[in-house]
């Protein structure tokens, strides 16, 4: 709450679709929320929120956020079924889970995972969704990730904070921004 009160930038809250988190977000009033899996049962094979299986719960939370003027993103796998359901719900954004791509970066499956992300971004864009991406993005794979079409925002945390431990947060952010926008 202290961070929310003193912030000078946007605050994005990653949260599960629970009553407690919904109430917390409605009190906190962040700029945006990203709905993520709450437990192992809600995780699809690659790790995104299964909005098809949990559409009623996701719809309730999304509707509550919309009514409060809080933008909502759904953290999903780049799977057509998940994207199509996301478009039917009232969240204006999706965050495509890039973890499978990041995990396959040095493996044979990298190209196929990248193709999935590109196809997912295109499908989401055509469906009228704002496209974000995140999970496992780092200083090496960003050069390819940044070429995914229709990306509005990338959510990168771990690699920036890890680099900041040795060179400071200013250098870590500056370097990532240079790699994102050469």
Descriptions of predicted regions:
Residues 1-19, 51-73, 109-133, 176-181:
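Alpha-helix-loop-beta-strand connector modules within alpha/beta enzyme cores
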Residues 1-10, 85-95, 144-158:
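Short, electropositive alpha-helical surface patch
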Residues 9-15, 33-35, 72-74, 94-96, ...:
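Hydrophobic faces of well-ordered beta-strands that scaffold small-molecule active sites
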Residues 11-52:
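Active-site beta->alpha loop and helix N-cap motifs at the rims of alpha/beta catalytic domains
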Residues 19-28, 79-89, 133, 137-151:
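Catalytic cores of alpha/beta
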Residues 35-42, 93-105, 149-169:
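Glycine-rich phosphate-binding active-site loops on the catalytic face of alpha/beta enzymes
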Residues 40, 71-127:
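Histidine/lysine/aspartate-rich catalytic loop segments that bind and position anionic ligands
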Residues 47, 106-110, 163-182:
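C-terminal helical cap(s) of enzyme catalytic domains, especially alpha/beta-barrels
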């Amino acid at each position: 709450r202290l961070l929310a009160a003193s912030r000078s930038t946007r605050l994005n809250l990653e949260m599960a679709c629970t009553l407690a988190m919904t109430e917390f977000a409605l009190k906190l009033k962040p700029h945006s929320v990203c709905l993520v899996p709450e437990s192992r049962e809600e995780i699809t094979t690659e790790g995104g929120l299964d909005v098809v299986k949990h559409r009623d719960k996701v719809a309730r939370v999304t509707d509550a956020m919309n009514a409060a003027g809080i933008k909502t993103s759904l953290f999903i796998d780049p799977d057509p079924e998940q994207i199509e359901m996301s478009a039917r719900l009232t969240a204006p954004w999706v965050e495509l889970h890039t973890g499978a791509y990041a995990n396959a970066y040095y493996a044979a499956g990298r190209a196929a995972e990248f193709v999935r992300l590109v196809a997912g971004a295109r499908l989401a864009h055509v469906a009228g969704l704002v496209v974000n991406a995140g999970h496992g993005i780092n200083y090496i794979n960003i050069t390819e990730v940044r070429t995914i079409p229709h990306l509005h925002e990338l959510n990168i945390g771990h690699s920036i904070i890890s680099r900041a431990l040795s060179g400071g947060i200013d250098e870590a952010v500056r370097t990532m921004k240079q790699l994102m926008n050469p």
